[in-house]
Design a protein with these regions (language model features):
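Charged C-terminal helix
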Residues: 139-167
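A short glycine-centered flexible hinge/capping loop motif at secondary-structure junctions
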Residues: 93-94, 148
């Protein structure tokens, strides 16, 4: 190793996927490609320019680097960067129906849910998972009703800002 070089860093980067890998994958499949772990608007724009089907805005649970920004912080920036060109899925921090509501308002087309389902499965098996799904949906519908949103399409960033009518 030369001065200032890190064997660990070099090894991690050696195995990290590149934009060339995305292009290679596009060349061997006709399946839609969705990239996970996109947090920066520049990366989102690059992915959109390559024609991927979607992005999963994720910080991998913050476990890889604990100072990684929260997905809710970066989602609006990523959404603005791609301007509706591709599907955005948010992964991380979804625990309640109001979290789903906020993610949709901030630009997500869908959310991924992990831990709540695992906890529900461990506690009560398949019935626990069904109950967790029902809770998320009920909480989302309540948040929609209280915000005056009759459909998912009506959930916009404005739904997160109190108005004179709600004061």
């Amino acid at each position: 190793l030369s001065a200032g070089q890190s064997a660990l860093f070099d090894n991690l980067l050696h195995h990290a996927p590149t934009w060339a890998d995305v292009q290679w994958l596009q060349g061997i499949t006709h399946l839609p490609i969705v990239l996970k772990g996109i947090l920066h608007p520049d990366d989102a724009r690059q992915a959109a320019s390559l024609g991927v089907a979607g992005l999963i805005v994720s910080n991998h649970g913050g476990r890889t680097l604990d100072t990684t920004p929260a997905t809710a912080t970066m989602l609006p920036r990523v959404a603005q960067a791609v301007g509706g060109q591709l599907m955005l899925i948010v992964d991380g921090g979804i625990r309640r129906g109001t979290d789903v509501f906020k993610a949709l308002a901030l630009g997500a087309d869908a959310v991924m849910v992990g831990r709540p389902y695992v906890y529900a499965l461990a506690a009560a098996g398949a019935l626990g998972v069904a109950h967790a799904i029902r809770l998320l949906r009920d909480e989302l519908e309540i948040a929609m009703a209280l915000s005056g949103c009759a459909t998912l399409d009506q959930i916009t960033p404005d739904a997160l800002i109190p108005t004179a009518h709600s004061a």
